[in-house]
Structure formats: structure tokens, C-alpha cells
Design a protein with these regions (language model features):
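Membrane-interface "cap" regions at the ends of multi-pass membrane proteins
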Residues: 1-52, 56-61, 74-79, 88-91, ...
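Extracellular loop-to-transmembrane helix junctions
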Residues: 26, 50-162, 166-169, 178-179, ...
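Hydrophobic, membrane-embedded alpha-helices of multi-pass small-molecule transporters
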Residues: 29-48, 190-203, 236-239, 254-308, ...
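TM-loop-TM module centered on a large, flexible mid-protein loop between adjacent transmembrane helices
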Residues: 96-97, 103, 135-151, 161, ...
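Membrane-interface loop-to-helix entry segments
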Residues: 130, 188-242, 299-303, 420-433, ...
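Hydrophobic alpha-helical segments and their helix-loop junctions in multi-pass secondary transporters
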Residues: 131-141, 223-252, 315-321, 431-448, ...
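C-terminal membrane-solvent junction of multi-pass transporters and transport-like membrane proteins
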Residues: 188-191, 203, 385-397, 431-479
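A generic transmembrane alpha-helix motif of multi-pass inner-membrane proteins
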Residues: 421-422, 426-427, 456-504
Length: 590
């Protein structure tokens, strides 16, 4: 009785797919296109926000060291992605890499997890784009209706002289301290975030029209934001005061993570997320002209250029203004103000750069997700409709339309905080699996030609995986619970649909009933069936209640505040194993 859930896709089959020019995608991307694609995915508004805030709270001028540490740590994962992308130039990214090393079930988990990284990221960043666009239009005296510029149900209040803003407890406290009667102000609730929905719809249409057109748009956005960053850095150097860099490493306050070397490492963890996005380059592998050579250049080149820009921004920003003054939503704008009235013209240009940066990030995320859907559909784990390629545009138009539609709905109704944390944990999980997969494949298939080789294996992959796991551990418990719920849904889809439609499973005549996993599921199914047939009813109810109490009690100890989420996870842990077993064995018992 062997393992069937972990069937590995033959790597030769992937290499044959990569060599097949009839896959449908247009091979139009050069090394330059791939590099700008990576920069487009990495550099968003974070460079204008995280740099100042991390310096003010954790590291001071030594934020420069934090960027170097974080860049090196992210490069560990980048090196692993570069080896895989050059060796297996298929659009599936981490999903495909896991399929060749860890098997189908774990590949499905990663593919399902990547939805959190790409689709949810597109929605998250589009909400940020909306905020910058509303602010930019206000500078031009163009005012959008407040009810259509925030997530559905968001409580808004109209502050005289400021306009409509989101009501928060801190804002109410601040207004009350200033003698303003908050109850007397106008209140309303947002309906949907129209600007966020608009940018997703526009970019989805662009991606359907063609990869070449999308790459050209991305190039313009990247040139715009990088150009503005370089202008700010050059001008800012003339306003640097060396006194602002002293002490370069502020002494620790006595609390871990607040300045000193512990603050440098804490800041490195915070700004790590400013590097996320380079992996999206690997989803365009089948559209690269020379993927074996150009994919590593695109992945590592974009990481290197972004790191240099981050470091230069950190040096200038902490040099023109003392770091304690950077704890604001727009630290770069504060830095521009410190240069004097003559430099006021830079403020709207910074906003334009932020809009360009966010636009390119949304584009890259919307590009990556449909190509992962396409690859999963080719493997039979998703319906075949997801693998359709437009005859004229040669893009996965059905997957692109679905991705865009779901992203539009999420961006229109959900707040950015929930979306952002799910993106972070989903991305880190994918990075971890890719790092581990490199070690597996080096041992299993050392004979495969590798145009690019990750150095110092297994040290580099292990360091990459450890750093990512460490970052995941720092995320809130409720984010982990949301991830578990998301994975429960994925398990159901896999066992109800994907395991039956898998191309490899059908081709090899996989019989789950005769596998180790089948024996376990059969036991679960039999146990629950007996439980549900117990009489009297009170015994049945008590048994089910007991099964619910065990996980609920554990979650209550870990996180006592989220009652509804505890109930949901406990119910999932109790019911989902039965649903999975039932879906597999219902035909056997029928």
C-alpha cells in the first residue's frame, strides 16, 4: 500500500512542456522586461512609507543596515526561485516547483496558498492606490464622493477643513481632546471603493489584450517611479545634515526591538515585506524569449536594483530630517517639507510616483495569478476552462477575467488590514516551500541541467526557509487562524474535485482506496458514521460537543478574544475530516 497523495509530476514532462512552442503563450519578454516586471512587483508605496516609519520606531539611521539584512535574507529565497525558473520555465511558479519535488497534494496546497499572495495582493494594493488617487485629486480640487472611496460599511465622518475620513477610536479621542463634538459631525457609511475597483478592471483588460502591451505599460510605470526616487535622492543629498545620522545606531531603550542592534533586526523583519513581488517574475516563464538565461537575471536583477534604491532612500531620508520625526503616514512628504518652500513642487511628484508604483504592483499580481490557474488547470486540478488561451491575444483570458472579477469584489468591500496580513503569510509560506524544494530536488535529481545553480546548498535554502518561518511566527494569531480556514476550504476542493480530475492520477490509474491515505480516510469515515448512528440522540450530541470542545479550548488558551473565529475553526477541525472522508468514500458506500 503506497502513498498516492504525494504523486510527483515527472520533471521530464515539465521540460517537454517548456520546450513546446505550441503552449499558446506569446514569447515576448526579454531580460529587461523581466527585470522591470520584478521591480514593478517589488517597489510600491512601501518605499515612501516603511522606510521612515521603521527608522522612527526601531532602527534610526541604522535602517540602512536593516535594508541590507532584509535584502540578503530575501535573496536566499530569490536564489532558489532563480534556479527553479531557469531549470523549469513553466508558468506555475512555486506550485510547479512543489509538484516536481513534494508531490501533488502539497503542490495543491501551495497553488491554493498563492491565491493569497497574488489575487489578494492585487486587491490590497488597489485599496492603497485608491487612497493615493483620492489625495492626488484633492490637490487638483477634484473631490470624489466619500461613500465610494472606502470599503463597504466603513464609518466615515466629515471633519471641517479636512473632509471625509475614516472614523477610528484614536481619531475620536484626538478630536475630543481638541474640543470637537464628534456626535455633531456628519456621519455616513461607505458603499464601495470605486477607484480600487476601477484600477483592477483597467489592468485586467490590459492583461487580456496582450503580454507585450502589459509589459510596455509596466515599463512606463517603473521608469516613472524609479525616476522620481532617483530625483528625490539626488536633490535630497544637498539637504543632508550629518548631525541627523548621529548616533548612527541609537542606544537601545531597554526594550527589545527599540533601537540598538535588536532594533535593527526588528526593522529588518518589518521591511522584509517591501521586497515581496520578485517571485511574480517566475509566473511569466513561458512568455520569456530565453527563460533559461533571462529568468535568473529578471529575479535577481530586480531584487538587486530594488535593494540599492531602498538603501539610497534610507540614507537620504534619515539625513535630511531627524528620524524621530518620520513616524507619520507620509514620511517622504515630511522630508520634502524640511527642504523648504522651494522644494514644495516635489510633493505632488512623489504622489505620482506612488501611484505609478502601486499601479505596477497591481499589474504584476494580476499577471501572476491567472498563469498559476492556467498551469493547475492543465494538470487537471482546476476545471479546463481556466487553461483556455485567447486565439488572438494568446493570453489566459478566462483566468484573467475571473481573477479580475474576484479582486474587484474584494477591493470594493474589504478593508486593507485583513487583506494585507493574509498576503504576508501566504507569500512567506510559498517562499518556505520553494527553499525546501531546492534541497529535495538536488538530492533526487542531481542530473538535471541547471542553467543557474543556487550556491551553498543546503545552507542558502535552509537560511531562506528559517527566515521566512521566523517572519510567519511574528504575525498575529488571528492571521494564522484565517490561513487555516482558507486551507480547510482548499482541502475540501482538492478531495471533492481535484483528486478525481488530476491528469497524473487518471493516467497512472491512481486508486486512493488502496493507499495509506485511503486507509486513514476510511477509518475517519467509519468512525464518524458510527457516531452519527448512535442512539439515543443525547449521546450523539454529547460526543459531537466533546469533539468541538477540544480544539475550542486550545484556541481559547492561545487567543481568548476571537469567539466567532474560535467557533469556526473548531467546527472546521471537527466536521471537515468527515466531509473529506465522505467525499472520497461516498461512492464506495453507495
Amino acid at each position: 500500500m503506497g502513498s498516492k497523495l504525494f504523486t510527483i509530476k515527472p520533471i521530464q514532462e515539465l521540460l517537454d512542456e517548456a520546450a513546446d512552442n505550441k503552449q499558446g503563450f506569446k514569447k515576448a519578454l526579454t531580460a529587461t522586461n523581466l527585470t522591470t516586471l520584478g521591480i514593478g512587483g517589488i517597489i510600491g508605496a512601501g518605499i515612501f512609507v516603511l522606510t521612515g516609519q521603521a527608522a522612527a520606531q526601531y532602527a534610526g539611521p541604522a535602517i540602512v543596515i536593516s535594508f541590507i539584512i532584509s535584502g540578503i535574507a530575501c535573496a536566499f529565497a530569490g536564489l532558489c526561485y532563480a534556479e527553479f525558473a531557469s531549470m523549469i520555465p513553466i508558468s506555475g511558479s512555486a506550485y510547479t516547483y512543489a509538484y516536481t519535488t513534494l508531490g501533488e497534494f502539497l503542490a495543491w496546497i501551495i497553488g491554493w496558498d498563492l491565491i493569497l499572495e497574488y489575487l489578494f495582493a492585487a486587491s490590497t494594493v488597489s485599496v492603497g492606490w485608491s487612497g493615493y488617487m483620492v489625495s492626488f485629486l484633492k490637490d487638483l480640487h477634484i473631490y470624489l464622493p466619500a461613500r465610494f472611496t472606502a470599503a463597504s460599511g466603513t464609518n466615515l465622518i466629515d471633519i471641517p477643513g479636512t473632509g471625509w475620513v475614516t472614523r477610528t477610536a484614536d481619531l475620536v479621542k484626538d478630536l475630543t481632546s481638541k474640543g470637537i463634538d464628534v456626535a455633531a459631525l456628519q456621519h455616513t457609511h461607505a458603499i464601495m471603493n470605486v477607484p480600487a475597483m476601477f484600477i483592477i478592471a483597467f489592468l485586467t483588460l490590459l492583461l487580456i489584450i496582450g503580454i507585450k502591451e502589459s509589459a510596455s505599460f509596466n515599463n512606463v510605470m517603473v521608469i516613472t517611479k524609479v525616476g522620481v526616487i532617483i530625483v528625490f535622492v539626488i536633490i535630497g543629498f544637498f539637504f543632508v545634515k550629518s548631525a541627523n545620522w548621529k548616533p548612527f545606531i541609537p542606544p537601545n531603550t531597554g526594550e527589545w526591538g527599540h533601537f540598538g542592534w535588536s532594533g535593527i533586526f526588528r526593522a529588518a523583519g518589518v521591511i522584509f515585506f517591501a521586497y515581496i513581488g520578485f517571485d511574480a517574475v517566475s509566473t511569466a516563464a513561458q512568455e520569456a524569449k530565453n527563460p533559461q538565461k533571462d529568468m535568473p537575471i529578471g529575479i535577481l536583477g530586480s531584487l538587486g536594483i530594488s535593494t540599492i534604491l531602498y538603501i539610497l532612500m534610507a540614507i537620504v531620508l534619515t539625513g535630511i530630517i531627524a528620524y524621530p520625526h518620520l513616524l507619520v503616514p507620509d514620511p517622504v512628504a515630511v522630508g520634502v517639507n524640511s527642504m523648504g518652500d522651494k522644494m514644495f513642487w516635489l510633493r505632488p511628484i512623489i504622489k505620482i510616483a506612488a501611484l505609478a508604483g502601486l499601479s505596477s504592483v497591481v499589474l504584476v499580481m494580476l499577471l501572476g495569478q491567472p498563469r498559476i490557474f492556467y498551469t493547475m488547470a492543465k494538470d487537471g486540478l482546476l476545471p479546463k476552462v481556466f487553461s483556455r488561451v485567447h486565439k488572438k491575444f494568446r493570453t489566459p483570458y478566462i483566468s484573467s477575467m475571473l481573477t479580475g472579477l474576484v479582486a474587484i469584489i474584494l477591493a470594493g468591500i474589504l478593508p486593507i488590514s485583513i487583506l494585507g496580513e493574509l498576503v504576508s503569510i501566504g507569500t512567506l509560506l510559498a517562499f518556505t516551500i520553494v527553499c525546501i524544494s531546492i534541497i529535495f530536488l538536488r538530492k533526487k535529481r542531481p542530473d538535471i541541467p541547471r542553467p543557474f545553480r543556487t550556491p551553498l546548498v543546503p545552507l542558502i535554502p535552509i537560511l531562506g526557509a528559517l527566515f521566512c518561518v521566523g517572519q510567519m511566527a511574528s504575525l498575529p494569531v488571528d492571521t494564522w487562524l484565517r490561513l487555516l480556514i482558507w486551507m480547510y476550504i482548499g482541502f475540501l476542493i482538492y478531495f471533492i474535485y481535484s483528486i478525481r480530475k488530476s491528469v497524473i492520477g487518471l493516467r497512472t490509474g491512481r486508486d486512493l482506496y488502496r493507499s495509506k491515505e485511503g486507509a486513514i480516510l476510511a477509518g475517519v469515515y467509519a468512525g464518524y458514521s458510527k457516531l452519527f448512528n448512535v442512539t439515543p440522540m443525547i449521546v450523539r450530541l454529547l460526543a459531537i460537543l466533546f469533539l468541538l470542545i477540544i480544539p475550542y479550548s486550545l484556541l481559547w488558551v492561545l487567543y481568548p478574544k476571537l469567539v466567532i473565529l474560535r467557533l469556526a475553526v473548531s467546527a472546521g477541525l471537527t466536521i471537515i475530516p468527515y466531509l473529506i472522508a465522505w467525499s472520497v468514500f461516498r461512492t464506495k458506500s453507495g
